């Protein structure tokens, strides 16, 4: 199966190729950025498909904890060392961390050069590689330093997932479930009826294509996250705080989003937007892939105060992304603090169910 989707916004128009990685031809210098693990698995395969006058490789450490300014400076140092100019190209070969960093580095190098995404994790393929959001972390939180910089193209090769560990695969499934809960009830039902598996490339590729199509439609309508695109942050408002509190060492991003979705669902239930049956159905689907659905909150008020650093918050009003049934979502900045604290307090117990 091979499919090409398109992102078309006011500032960009680029293809998303879903299928076996084609040959990539470029007339100028190329800097490919990856990490040791991904490079060991896929670098040779990818380099054989790049046709360019000069191709250089930059290897950065693996892990969310390295998505910082130090790594960006190293990528830029590689670019300067190899004399990349404004017509040069960067390629991100890896998961969401690599994609975020290369997107950011290419966006600020000489005021911006082209880059291409070749995502190698399910999470990056269905979400992080599409849409042009880039960023790095700092001590205050996740992705607080960044910019919108759309790639020149995205190449999604589902066969690269054959080497993906089970836990990484599950983290990506969380983002697929997110898309279904927010925008497509029929897709959610399909995910309930069938099992996503690396061993079933046909259904997996269809699920990837469906998720990317949803993301593309949202980005085309709202490139800079001024409206509906904020709905894609379902699970992330809570999840980013969990990642920060655990210093990006306890949960994969998709796992933190899974917990965040459950917290958002609990808040939706409290506000009467979601039934208990719907909440339980979402949790059950997440748990099918061994995704966490609970996080022990030691201090609900301390957790609440961290919402003030969320990028969606404006004028000290916290924007929550809350499901209204399955297939619909609401952006709310009027949720009473007491209701949020009640939900957070419920996660201070042994079970969030």
UniProtKB/Swiss-Prot annotation:
Keywords of this entry: Amino-acid biosynthesis, Aromatic amino acid biosynthesis, Cobalt, Cytoplasm, Lyase, Metal-binding, NAD, Nucleotide-binding, Zinc
Entry cofactors: NAD(+); Co(2+); Zn(2+)
InterPro entries: Dehydroquinate_synthase, DHQ_synth_AroB, DHQ_synth_fam, DHQS/DOIS_N, DHQS_C
Subcellular location as annotated: Cytoplasm
GO terms of biological process kind: amino acid biosynthetic process; aromatic amino acid family biosynthetic process; chorismate biosynthetic process
CDD domains: DHQS
Catalytic class of the enzyme: lyase
The reaction(s) this protein catalyses: 7-phospho-2-dehydro-3-deoxy-D-arabino-heptonate = 3-dehydroquinate + phosphate
Main location: cytoplasm
Pathway: Metabolic intermediate biosynthesis; chorismate biosynthesis; chorismate from D-erythrose 4-phosphate and phosphoenolpyruvate: step 2/7
Record Pfam families: DHQ_synthase, DHQS_C
Any single GO CC term annotated in Swiss-Prot or TrEMBL for this entry: cytoplasm
Gene3D superfamilies: 3.40.50.1970, Dehydroquinate synthase-like - alpha domain
Ligand binding (NAD(+)): 62-67, 96-100, 120-121, 133, 142
GO molecular function: 3-dehydroquinate synthase activity; metal ion binding; nucleotide binding
Protein residues bound to Zn(2+): 175, 236, 253
EC number(s) recorded for this UniProt protein: 4.2.3.4
Family under the similarity heading: Belongs to the sugar phosphate cyclases superfamily. Dehydroquinate synthase family.
Protein's job: Catalyzes the conversion of 3-deoxy-D-arabino-heptulosonate 7-phosphate (DAHP) to dehydroquinate (DHQ).
Protein's name according to its UniProt entry: 3-dehydroquinate synthase
Species in which this protein is naturally found: Helicobacter hepaticus (strain ATCC 51449 / 3B1)
Origin organism lineage: Bacteria, Pseudomonadati, Campylobacterota, Epsilonproteobacteria, Campylobacterales
Gene name as annotated: aroB
